[in-house]
UniProtKB/Swiss-Prot annotation:
Catalyzes the 2-thiolation of uridine at the wobble position (U34) of tRNA, leading to the formation of s(2)U34. Pfam families: tRNA_Me_trans, tRNA_Me_trans_C, tRNA_Me_trans_M. This is tRNA-specific 2-thiouridylase MnmA. Keywords: ATP-binding, Cytoplasm, Disulfide bond, Nucleotide-binding, RNA-binding, Transferase, tRNA processing, tRNA-binding. Disulfide bonds join 105-203. The record marks 130, 341 as: Interaction with tRNA. The keyword Cytoplasm applies. It comes from the Bacteria. It is found in: Cytoplasm. The keyword RNA-binding applies. InterPro entries: MnmA-like, MnmA-like_C, MnmA-like_central, MnmA-like_central_sf, Rossmann-like_a/b/a_fold. GO terms for cellular component: cytoplasm. It comes from Pelotomaculum thermopropionicum (strain DSM 13744 / JCM 10971 / SI).
């Protein structure tokens, strides 16, 4: 009997390596693919295992594949990564917004471009090392994404863009394990990456200095005015891409009081600063909505909502608005609701969906 073929996205890290091992143990025909999505150059080799696209990472993935006895290939996805992730990342900062590149990569590269490539070579599924639980719910009549067993490793926030087709064709076996269990499995299989450290947050910025990256990639960054809450000029900023809502440190301004970034105005190249209470808000409007648990949103819905990757969820009312937008009104104030970031909605363990924050404001009365 022919085995079901699964393509595993192998980064050379522990999670994707254990994903491949578990699926192989379960009887699948596993093919490892490492996605070459960014050319980090020679600098990456000095960073070793911290970057996903270095020769070290590719070699680690190959060594794991050899240990498991599976095929392994390196495929070039640089063009679509440049377009959908790098260009998006820089353009959003130039617009005074704070992007989330992992969401864009998952949405357009891993679960679209890689899935299409996998299906074209006869695979029925792709698999990744994300910590989430995928399945089908008879109650909802939908393919679903649920929070993982290990809540500390929960990655559902960056998966809200997945479609029904993508969820149906994707496996995430680590959703049922804790990180400690995953490392133990890696040791039990004798995988050469069992003790490897976690990868960095933004894979294409090797030194974690996104300001340096933007200076090199983006043209037209200019200094401009810092304004107080009355609209008066109180200083100069170095360029709006270098700041984000809620930021206090690194403003370079001696004001005699603690000031925070309250608003970024790209049209006037201005940044408004104010006291901490000014960065708290209850309501937001979001666009580019993707729903997983429901086909559509016809009426207000009580949800748990999350405005940043590491933030806690908070009770909120989700409201459909014209032109495909949604409004979110939190029951309690939230800190630093930031345009460009994602707001993601949950019902219990189930991921309802998410959207991109456009603005804050009291739309909800």
């Amino acid at each position: 009997m022919e085995k079901t073929k699964v393509v595993v996205a192998m980064s050379g890290g522990v999670d994707s390596s254990v994903t491949a091992a578990l699926l192989l143990e379960q009887g699948f025909e596993v093919i490892g693919i490492t996605m070459q999505i960014w050319n980090p150059g020679e600098e990456a080799e000095s960073k070793g295992e911290r970057t996903c696209c270095s020769l070290t990472a590719i070699d680690d993935a190959r060594r794991v594949a050899d240990k498991l006895g599976i095929s392994h290939y390196v495929l070039n996805f640089r063009s679509i990564f440049e377009e959908k992730v790098i260009d998006y990342f820089t353009s959003e900062y130039l617009r005074g917004r704070t992007p989330n590149p992992c969401i864009a990569c998952n949405r357009y590269v891993k679960f679209e471009a890689l899935l299409d490539r996998a299906l074209s070579i006869g695979a029925e599924y792709i698999a990744t090392g994300h910590y989430a639980r995928l399945g089908y719910s008879g109650e909802y009549g939908r393919y679903t994404v649920r929070r993982p067993v290990d809540r500390r490793k929960d990655q559902t926030y960056v998966l809200y863009g997945m479609t029904q087709r993508q969820i149906a064709r994707t496996m995430m076996p680590l959703g049922n394990y804790t990180k400690g269990q995953v490392r133990k499995i890696a040791e039990d299989f004798g995988l050469p990456v069992a003790g490897k450290a976690e990868s960095q947050e933004i894979c294409f910025i090797l030194d974690d200095d996104y300001r340096r990256f933007l200076r090199e990639k983006a043209a037209g960054i200019k200094p401009g005015p810092f304004l107080n809450m009355k609209g008066e000029v109180i200083g100069r900023h170095n360029g709006i891409p270098f700041y984000t809502v809620g930021q206090r440190r690194g403003l370079g301004l001696a004001a005699g009081e603690r000031l925070y970034v309250v608003k970024i105005d790209p049209e006037n190249n201005a940044i408004t600063l104010g006291p901490e209470e000014a960065v708290w808000g209850r309501s937001l409007i979001a666009a580019d909505v993707n729903l997983i648990l429901y086909e559509s949103l016809e009426e207000p819905l009580e949800v748990e909502a999350q405005v940043r990757y590491n933030a806690r969820t908070s009770p909120a009312t989700l409201v459909p608005l014209p032109e495909g937008r949604v409004g979110v009104h939190f029951h309690t104030p939230q800190r630093s609701i930031t345009p460009g970031q994602a707001v993601v909605f949950y019902r219990g363990d189930y991921l309802i969906g998410g959207a991109t924050i456009e603005s804050t404001g009291d739309f909800f009365r």
